[in-house]
Structures are given as C-alpha cells and as structure tokens.
C-alpha cells in the first residue's frame, strides 16, 4: 500500500490545541474542517481561520482528535468507524490505556497513530490559538504494535510541517 500525501484534515475539537493545529495546517495550504460539540468554540475557531465547519463533504485523509482524554477513546473509535480510509491521530496526554480502550471498542487500530504535542499556553480555548504553537516543540508519536508504518510516517510528516520535532516512543 502506498498512501498519497495528506491534503485534507478533519480536526475534532476546536480548543487551543485543535484550533492551533488547524491554523498551522491552513497556512501550509491544507484543507481543514472542524467539528466540536461546543458551538461557541467552533465559531471562534472558524473566525480565527482554523478551518471550515465540518463534517467534510468527502472523507478526510487525516482525522486529528483534540478532545479531553476522558472522551478521546470513544471519539477516536467513532472516527475510525466513520472514515474508513482515513488515518486517525490524537493529542491526548495519556496513551497506553487510551490505545487499549480504542482497540476494545472494535476500531481498526492499524489506522490509529497516537500522538501528543508537548505544547500549550497559560490560557485555553480557540481565542488563544496560535499557528506557531508547535514550532520547535516535541510531538510524541506512540504507534502501537499493529499501527501501519506508512500511516505513522504520514502523520510524522504532517507534524513536522508544523515545525514540531517528532519523537517516537512507546505508549
């Protein structure tokens, strides 16, 4: 299998991290859609240029789940079930348990590339988002034993395009 370059991204969660990812990707010419249960956060993120209101009109190449860790497993699994060809990554701070929970939900973990940017600010929400938030920051990728290597490389390329330094580690 040879994956085409990632050109379209759906970000689920438009807080500080999700909106910052969207802003950075859009400055690099990517098509970005946003989804968020919080309509106010979504509106602010769209106004700040983080992306277009989703869902996308076609399957995205990449889904980035940027929601609180407590709901991340179910949102990741739902994304893997909904977008059958997309690679799915996340930004949650916990990894080993999250990966077990995603797998227990019957999701295709070969397409799941867990990640966590070591970046943030003293303020939260999409109003505080910055396109340069990830510049020179470590972004850990923690692929599981069944994660597809090409998908991991594709996510690493996107992360590096944000100016982040990719570190691959175990969950």
Where are these regions (language model features)?
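Short beta->alpha hinge that forms the Motif I/post-I loop of the SAM-binding pocket
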Residues: 37, 67, 91-93
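Internal alpha-helical scaffold of NAD(P)-dependent oxidoreductase catalytic cores
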Residues: 133-171
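NAD(P)+-binding Rossmann beta1-loop-alpha1 motif at the extreme N-terminus of oxidoreductases
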Residues: 1-54, 62
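N-terminal Rossmann-like NAD(P) cofactor-binding module of classical short-chain dehydrogenase/reductase
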Residues: 63-64, 89
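Phosphate-coordination loops involved in phosphoryl transfer and adenosine-cofactor binding
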Residues: 5-8, 60, 85, 136
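Residues at the starts of beta-strands that form the adenosine-phosphate
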Residues: 8, 31, 111, 138, ...
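Rossmann-like NAD(P)(H) cofactor-binding subdomain of soluble oxidoreductases
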Residues: 75-128
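Structural motif
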Residues: 10, 64-66, 140
């Amino acid at each position: 299998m040879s994956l085409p370059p990632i050109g379209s991204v759906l970000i689920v969660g438009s807080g500080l991290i999700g909106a910052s990812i969207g802003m950075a990707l859009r400055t690099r010419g990517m098509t970005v859609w946003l989804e968020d249960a919080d309509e106010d956060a979504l509106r602010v993120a769209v106004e700040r240029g983080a992306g277009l209101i989703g869902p996308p009109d076609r399957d995205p190449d990449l889904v980035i789940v940027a929601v609180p860790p407590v709901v991340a497993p179910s949102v990741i699994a739902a994304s893997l079930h909904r977008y059958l060809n997309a690679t799915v990554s996340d930004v949650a701070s916990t990894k080993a348990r999250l990966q077990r929970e995603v797998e227990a939900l019957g999701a295709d973990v070969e397409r799941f590339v867990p990640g966590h940017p070591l970046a943030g600010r003293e303020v939260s929400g999409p109003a505080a988002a910055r396109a340069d938030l990830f510049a020179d920051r470590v972004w850990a990728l923690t692929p599981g034993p069944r994660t597809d290597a090409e998908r991991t490389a594709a996510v690493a390329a996107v992360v590096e395009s944000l100016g982040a330094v990719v570190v691959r580690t175990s969950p």
